UniProtKB/Swiss-Prot annotation:
Residues 250-261 have a biased composition (Polar residues). SMART domains: S_TKc. This is Mitogen-activated protein kinase kinase kinase 19. It comes from Mus musculus (Mouse). It comes from the Eukaryota. The keyword Transferase applies. The active site is at D1169. Residues 85-119, 250-274, 330-363, 396-472, 486-508, 576-607, 734-767 are annotated as: Disordered. CDD domains: STKc_YSK4. Disulfide bonds: none annotated.
Length: 1311
């Protein structure tokens, strides 16, 4: 909307209050117009915290631009506004009589009685509701709260109003749930009022019986729009919560106010085509409050249309402290029932002005209002809801909630928005938001069809600026406003009893909620909207017994009202408690008090975000009125967020304490028990958890950013604590320290030096976190001797996740944490109870090479005879050996020279991992390390973060390490003296399976080498000198532990998978792992025995063309064979990469293959599986034969000796199998010659013989003794073809041997 020129100020400003406090009511010149009565009620307290209540100015043309300085009034003023006359309809006496009934009843909580209209005039429906806290919801010493109604009626014109009638109704507010709606508005130029999805409410000052004054306002008829003759009288009715059945009241329409006239009677400039729009209409009064129209649908009531002429009588009753909700109803010309919309308030912030004696409403533009649906035949119906809401200690709960889902976006005619400006001293802006509260109970079915016609309301943020130039905004007729002020009420007697019930002191605040409601014409609905309505109706039924507690406290200040954590669960986003359903939940973010004066344009999306995990709200007991709800909005961070007001007083400064104090802890503990049941657990988008109550002060950010609706999952996923998190302060707040202001926009939880977790800026603190924090706050600091690990169930969220993190990343620990649960380590365990980690399955874990450049090795602690030392004591649960049976006994032998030469120790507790480095010259089998405090311990005990705790733990660790080292040295000395290296050769068994002692006399020493938890057995006599050097002589002599890391897969075979590994010595190795079938114990033992024989055979093979064997390891049911790594890959891979090989190349390769096979045959070893995949190529061109284990297994034809087992074992190799192997006619050395011929054919052509056949077909072809094998292509030389023909001789007895083939002419070319 374009900016409009600023109109002049006129004395005809709406709601002008007489300048003399004691003067009689002013009577203005009354033309032939209607007068609207307005009444002001004063209070004994100041309306403003800073200045006198500014009188209102009567708006009329030609008046002075500024009003005089009037003294403060001590009595109320009744204001009568006149409107141009219009044809009125006649009201039936029956309706008048029914509408004049006034009921005043006191109700106990959760009981609601309808309130009848007053009996003096046609009740247009203004009834105010004072919502106050109930004893069941608030911890107050007052009795049950009352609902004080204020009835305002329109009566025939008269010069001055008399306060003869007042309608009041007492009713306790029943627990209901208010529903919120975000509203949208367009941006308008500077110094205009900006709207956003926020609001700020201030509690009302005390109200009492106040004197009344009345004056008449004349609103001149606007000549700019004479064609608009429709008038509308907004009817105000008592908005009683939990009205589950409609209140039937007769209502007649006296006039329909023309929207264009309404605007132009107040402002002289602006567009002519202003029409009322149900969703954006706003009333503006001189106290800087806007009266918005809300197109909300609520309890529909049947109001017979009646005609009413002249003036309507307005009357107000006494107030009780608490928010007053005024719901306005629309009047229709015809007899169709109209909708009574209720519980929809526009919370308008109170404007205070310092140093000025008068307040002016400034506006930059007029608003173009459009009647959405119902302006077409029977006139515009605009329900107006005036809601006077007190923030302090109030419970506002509508009976049912309406869904915004079936509201239709206004069309082009109804898209205009209302823009206006206001002012506030000291550049402190207060913002407003418009909640939507529409109960879904309708008395008339046709009225329900109008739900689809509701326009989308928009949240408005109204920063109040210093402005003294009054400009009138386009308004609809203002019906009634109650202003708290000073003095005593002179109202009728029946209103006074309700005022006498008021016992608690009120707090300084002036807050108004005024909403404009629209009445929809049921005749305008179409089929589509009816369908939408019917679908919406089924979803918009909320439980009537839902309850929301409100907590608020106000800090008085000299210049402004400091809002302390005002919480309106049904109106704001701040309420973290569960909500009935995501469908019913619409929340508008809280307005931040510190937001700057700037226009904000919200999104086009009018529907607020819906919580994904909304739960049923359960009633809870909130804290007292003085208690500040510590659950803060992430955009509402201010001084009061860090300090809690202890003694709240209406005057004078308050006493505050920080949140971390015992007082806060006590309050939080109480609140945790009281509110645990209805708090909603929210989650943030990146699955992150808030573990701290502290949130950063983000006033600069929230002034420029729109509040976002964030919800947490119901099951909190704790964040990963970072390395800086201390053990002592992990997950809880120290009680002697308050929360810090944490700035920044961290996306992940980060830890502060004090151990607190900083949460992302958009996260809310969930109730689950609150409970955890409350559980942790009172915990005193534990000394290292007292910090015994608690059970997992007692740990906080942070501790539990930290434990999981540590166990997963660092691979540590068991329940006994620091030391292994060995017989002699129980004393060290008692000395180290401060281990913070919880049980994992493995007792020990090795710090991998990525985390530590040093290796750790086990330590022996028992000094017992060698024949009674069990494997667990000798190798205590280290590297997956933790599950060794305690009953298993193994004989242990160590070389005396090995131990004696390597007994020196260098315990260095100050090292990073409290582990000694592995020197190749030192024997590390008898040294244990406290890997419990490995890298994790260093991270937890970082001296920069907790020096005292680190020093204590370091001291304890030093003492324990020294004691254990001394003990271990003695143990090793004794064991060394008792060991006999000539007789004992031992192997540690897995899971208590003892390996038989090698009884034969031999100089071979079974060397246990730990390679990634696997034991490698090396026999010294089979290793050549070069290989000994490669594997390090010291490792053979001193049994050095070697670790390896598994890498990528090099290949897969029928019997296992080959991996590339990197040892701790920096060597690349090939590790073949074969899985053993453990289902049959006998078969497994037999298979293992055969594999052991095969391994023993392979260890004897030392040839340049045979891959070097390094060792084996049996881990559970997996056998690992460690071999020399050949980086060039297999011949098959070379063929795949480069194609068929040239004759000279494969001739050279064939010669080396034959040399290796000849070596095998000389040692009575038959490979039986020579093929391209089992022939490896070194980068230097050296050929290596591999996979001897599979060849040996093929000779046995499977464990059971059946053909099926053989076929299974032969999968993938039938093209290279000799006929005798397939026929199982007997194995011999000549079978390898057949395989060599097939391999040469593969190198020459790229594929083995019979590759065009299926595997099974090829096997039958080869074994049938009928078909001839294909020869080499003609492009190869004759010697090459003859060599292949000889190798593929079907009769194995006629086949040449390897030595004979080495003399073949084909191989002579390669020499």
């Amino acid at each position: 909307m374009d900016s409009m020129p600023r109109p002049e100020r006129h004395a005809e400003s709406l709601l002008d209050i007489c300048h003399e406090a004691g003067s009689t009511p002013m009577e203005m010149t009354v033309s032939q117009t209607e007068n609207l009565t307005l009444q002001s009620i004063s209070s004994s307290e100041d309306f403003d915290l800073e200045d006198d209540f500014s009188p209102f100015i009567l708006a009329r043309e030609g008046a002075a631009p500024r009003g005089e300085n009037w003294p403060r009034r001590t009595e109320g003023v009744e204001i009568i506004v006149t409107f141009p006359p219009d044809p009125l309809q006649e009201a039936s006496q029956e309706d008048l009589k029914e509408s004049n009934q006034v009921t005043s009843e006191h109700q106990e909580r959760e009981q609601v009685h309808p309130v009848s209209p007053p009996d003096d005039a046609e009740m247009v429906g203004l009834t105010g509701r004072m919502l106050t806290t109930q004893p069941s919801l608030l911890k107050t010493d007052g009795s049950s709260e009352e609902l004080c109604g204020v009835d305002v009626a329109l009566s025939p014109p008269r010069p001055c109003l008399d306060s003869s009638l007042a309608a009041s109704a007492a009713g306790e507010v029943a627990p209901c749930v208010l529903k919120e709606q975000q509203r949208q508005s367009d941006e308008f130029p500077t110094s205009d009022i900006s709207y956003s999805s926020r609001r700020t409410g201030l509690p009302l000052p005390p109200l009492s019986c106040l004197p009344m004054r009345s004056c008449i306002f004349n609103m001149e008829k606007s000549p700019k729009s004479p064609r608009h003759r429709e008038r509308k009288v907004p009817s105000l009715s008592l908005s009683v919560p939990k009205l589950l059945e409609p209140l039937s009241r007769p209502l007649s329409q006296s006039a329909e106010f023309s929207s264009s006239k309404n605007h132009q009677e107040v402002t002289q400039e602006g567009p002519v085509e202003h029409t009322l729009r149900g969703s954006n209409c706003t009333l503006w009064s001189r106290n800087m409050c806007s009266f918005r129209k809300s197109g909300k649908q609520g309890v529909a009531e049947s109001w017979p249309s009646q005609e009413m002429e002249g003036w309507d009588k307005t009357k107000t009753s006494g107030f009780k402290e608490g928010p007053s909700l005024f719901s306005c109803e629309s009047v229709k010309e015809d007899t169709t029932p109209t909708e009574r919309e209720r519980d929809s308030g526009y919370h308008v912030s109170e404007m205070q002005r310092g140093g000025e004696d008068s307040q002016y409403l400034s506006s930059r533009k007029k608003e173009s209002w459009t009647a959405r649906v119902v302006e077409r035949d029977s006139g515009v119906e605009h329900p107006i809801l005036c809601k006077l809401l007190e923030v302090s200690n109030s419970e506002m709960t509508p009976a049912e909630e309406k869904e915004i889902g079936n509201e239709n976006v206004p069309d082009a005619k109804s898209n205009s928005v209302h823009k206006s400006g206001a002012m506030e001293p000291h550049a402190a802006s207060e913002e407003v938001s418009v909640p939507k509260n529409g109960p879904s109970v309708n008395s008339d079915g046709p009225a329900e069809e109008l739900e689809g016609h509701r326009d989308i309301e928009q949240n408005r943020k109204i920063p109040m600026e210093e402005e003294t130039n009054p400009e009138m905004n386009g308004v609809v007729p203002l019906t009634h406003i109650a202003f708290p002020g000073e003095g005593t009420s002179k109202g009728p007697a029946r209103a006074e009893p309700h005022l006498q019930r008021r016992k608690r002191p009120a707090q300084n605040s002036n807050s108004f909620n005024l909403l404009a409601h629209r009445e929809h014409d049921k005749l305008q609905t179409n089929t589509h909207r009816t369908k939408l309505d019917s679908r919406t109706k089924a979803r918009n039924r909320a439980p009537p017994n839902l309850m929301v507690s409100i907590q608020a406290s106000i800090k008085p200040n000299m210049h402004k009202n400091s809002i302390k954590t005002q919480v309106f669960p049904a109106l704001e986003l701040i309420d973290h408690r569960p909500h009935p359903s995501s469908k019913f939940q619409r929340r508008a973010p809280l307005t931040e008090k510190k937001s700057t004066h700037q226009t904000q344009k919200p999104k086009k999306q009018a529907f607020p975000r819906i919580g994904k995990h909304a739960g049923i709200k359960k009633p809870g007991i909130p804290l007292s009125a003085e208690t500040t709800d510590p659950r803060l909005h992430f955009l509402d961070l201010k001084y009061s967020d860090m300090f809690k007001e202890i003694n709240s007083a209406s005057n004078g400064p308050g006493i505050y304490e920080m949140f971390g104090t015992p007082v806060y802890c006590h309050i939080r503990e109480a609140e945790r028990h009281d509110h645990r049941c209805y708090r909603e657990i929210r989650t943030a988008p990146s699955g992150r958890c808030v573990v701290n109550k502290c949130q950063s002060s983000e006033s600069d950010r929230c002034s420029n950013s729109r509040a976002r609706l964030l919800q947490k999952r119901q099951h909190i996923k704790p964040p990963k604590p970072l390395h800086g998190l201390r053990q002592k302060h992990r997950g809880f707040i120290s009680k002697d320290k308050g929360c810090k202001d944490m700035g920044g926009h961290t996306e992940d939880s980060v830890s502060e030096p004090d151990g607190q977790m900083k949460s992302p800026g958009n996260d809310f603190l969930s109730s689950k976190d609150d409970a955890q924090l409350m559980h942790l706050i009172p915990i005193p600091e534990l000394s290292p001797e007292q910090k015994a690990p608690a059970p997992v169930s007692d740990l906080s969220i942070v501790e539990e996740i930290f434990t999981e993190e540590c166990a997963d990343e660092e691979g540590i620990l068991n329940d006994d944490s620091l030391t292994q649960s060995l017989g002699d380590l129980k004393e060290p365990e008692g000395l180290h109870p401060q281990a913070p980690l919880v049980p994992s399955e493995n007792s020990w874990a090795v710090l991998s090479e990525k985390r530590s450049g040093k290796r750790v090795s086990p330590e022996k602690h028992n000094v017992e005879p060698l024949d009674k030392i069990n494997a667990e004591q000798m190798f205590p649960g280290y590297l997956e050996f933790d599950s060794l049976s305690e009953k298993s006994k193994t004989l242990v032998s160590f070389s005396s020279c090995s131990f004696q030469e390597n007994l020196e120790r260098a315990p260095s507790p100050t090292e990073q991992h409290w582990a000694r480095s592995l020197e190749q010259d030192s024997l590390e089998n008898n040294s244990t390390t406290y890997q419990t405090f490995g890298k994790i311990s260093q991270e937890i005990l970082d001296p920069g973060k907790n020096e005292e705790l680190t020093d204590e733990l370091l001291g304890c660790l030093v003492e324990e390490l020294l004691a254990l080292d001394e003990k271990d040295n003695n143990s090793c000395q004794i064991m060394t003296n008792e060991a006999d290296a000539k007789n004992l050769n031992l192997v540690f068994s897995r899971r208590g399976n003892t390996i038989e002692e090698l009884g034969r006399e031999t100089t071979d020493v079974k060397l246990q080498r730990c390679i990634n938890g696997f034991r490698i057995y090396d026999e010294e006599n089979f290793l050549t000198s070069n290989e000994k050097k490669t594997l390090s002589d010291k490792s053979l002599n001193h049994e050095e532990a070697i670790f390896w890391t598994k890498g990528e897969i090099l290949g897969r075979g029928a019997y296992g998978t080959v991996y590339c590994g990197l040892t701790s010595l920096g060597q690349l190795i090939a590790v073949k792992q074969v899985a053993l079938d453990t289902s049959d114990k006998l078969a497994t033992e037999k298979e293992y025995r055969k594999l052991q024989e095969e391994v023993d055979l392979l260890k004897a093979l030392k040839h340049v063309n045979i891959v070097a064997y390094l060792g084996t390891c049996l881990e559970e049911n997996t056998l690992s064979i460690f071999m020399e790594f050949v980086p060039g890959g297999s011949i098959s891979s070379i063929i795949n990469r480069f194609g068929p090989l040239p004759e000279m190349v494969f001739c050279k390769y064939t010669r080396q293959i034959l040399q290796g096979v000849a070596y095998l045959h000389d040692n009575c070893v038959v490979h039986r599986d020579i093929k391209g995949n089992n022939v490896m190529l070194m980068p230097t061109g050296i050929i290596k034969l591999i996979d001897f284990g599979c060849a040996k297994r093929l000779a046995w034809a499977g464990l059971n000796g059946t053909h099926s087992d053989m076929l299974k074992s032969m999968r993938g190799t039938p093209y290279w199998m000799a006929p005798e192997v397939i026929n199982e006619s007997g194995y011999g050395r000549k079978s390898d010659i057949w395989s060599i011929g097939c391999t040469v054919f593969e190198m020459a052509t790229g594929k083995p013989p019979l590759a065009s056949m299926d595997r099974m077909a090829a096997m039958f072809y080869i074994g049938a003794h009928r078909g001839l094998m294909p020869p080499l292509p003609a492009r190869f030389s004759e010697p090459a073809a003859d060599f292949v023909r000889l190798c593929l001789t079907r009769d194995q007895h006629e086949r040449p041997s390897a030595l004979q083939l080495l003399k073949h002419s084909f191989l002579k070319r390669s020499q």
